[in-house]
């Protein structure tokens, strides 16, 4: 069975029947091509404040083992509940932020990445038509994986991520060099939603990237001031479009392999493990070890950052 809306379902003692054959009477499994979640998600309220009721709901439903499909924040909460209630818990990483430790893949990341790259492909044409700098703000919370991967794959000129400090002077110099040296009159900037203020503003606590319109607008305003309004910018905040859509083939394969191994672990009575993808196969790690290492940040000296620099992308100082 499935538990609808995570711990809310345990509170209300609700279950949803699941079948290997899917919901279609003709035997067509719609789940592979469905985005999001058929069970629903929960991201509000103080879950641990209702711990006793949740634990009672778990016992009332008589669950033998629980597979939690979640990102790092939800994993921390569900693990605390599992420890309190002595649950048999298996975790599967599912987040577009790609910030769960130890795993090279998380369900949803590849689909979101493809959505962003598709958006960049479309926005390049309007940027080129009007000789504009298009600033694309993407999700990622406190990590820059989505911005870094999509920026490289989409041919961005500037990528800004939380893990690498940057200067507005450096951005404007790069944009000017693109125009003067390479005669490129437009540019694409990919901005992660979790970036901090530029180095020029780092010592000024009164300045924040949390403007009414987000970090993309902060960068646009800084570029306008730096260039004396000679650089024409437009901001596109992709928002929740990144969290939906038809799952990519890679995400379908990853989810299927994670699911198979999760069931195998339950059959072997091996619990308190999170599944991870490393070196082309599914492996396991103790959940507590994963939580201790979360979130998984971009390595500023890593191969992807160095690849971006080698491609002539400005990615900070």
Each predicted region: which residue ranges?
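Short, structured coil segments at secondary-structure junctions
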Residues: 34-35, 84-85, 154-155
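Glycine-rich oxoanion-binding loops at beta->alpha junctions
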Residues: 10-68, 73-74, 105-118
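C-terminal non-catalytic interaction/assembly regions of soluble proteins
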Residues: 211, 215-317
């Amino acid at each position: 069975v499935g538990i609808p809306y995570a711990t809310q379902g345990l509170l209300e003692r609700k279950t949803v029947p699941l079948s290997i054959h899917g919901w279609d009477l003709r035997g067509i499994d719609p789940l592979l091509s469905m985005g999001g979640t058929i069970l629903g998600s929960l991201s509000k309220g103080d879950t641990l404040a209702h711990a006793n009721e949740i634990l009672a709901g778990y016992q009332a439903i008589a669950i033998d083992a629980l597979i939690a499909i979640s990102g790092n924040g939800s994993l921390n909460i569900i693990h605390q509940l599992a420890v309190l209630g002595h649950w048999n818990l298996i975790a599967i990483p599912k987040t577009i932020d790609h910030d769960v430790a130890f795993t090279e893949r998380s369900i949803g990341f590849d689909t979101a990445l493809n959505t962003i790259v598709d958006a960049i492909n479309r926005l390049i044409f309007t940027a080129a038509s009007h000789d504009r700098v298009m600033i694309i703000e993407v999700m990622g919370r406190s990590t820059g994986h989505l911005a870094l991967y999509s920026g490289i794959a989409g041919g961005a000129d500037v990528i800004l991520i939380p893990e690498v400090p940057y200067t507005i002077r450096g951005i404007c110099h790069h944009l000017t060099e693109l125009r003067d040296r390479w005669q490129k009159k437009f540019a694409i900037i990919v901005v992660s939603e979790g970036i901090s203020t530029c180095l020029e503003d780092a010592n000024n606590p009164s300045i924040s990237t949390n403007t009414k319109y987000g970090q993309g607008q902060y960068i646009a305003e800084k570029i306008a001031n730096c260039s004396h309004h000679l650089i024409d910018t437009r901001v596109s905040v992709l928002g929740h479009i990144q969290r939906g859509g038809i799952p990519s083939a890679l995400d379908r394969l990853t989810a299927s392999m994670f699911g198979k191994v999760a069931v195998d672990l339950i059959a072997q009575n091996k619990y308190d493990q999170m599944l991870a993808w490393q070196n082309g196969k599914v492996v396991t790690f103790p959940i507590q070890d994963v939580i201790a290492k979360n979130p998984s940040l971009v390595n500023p000296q890593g191969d992807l950052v160095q690849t971006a620099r080698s491609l002539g992308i400005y990615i900070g100082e």
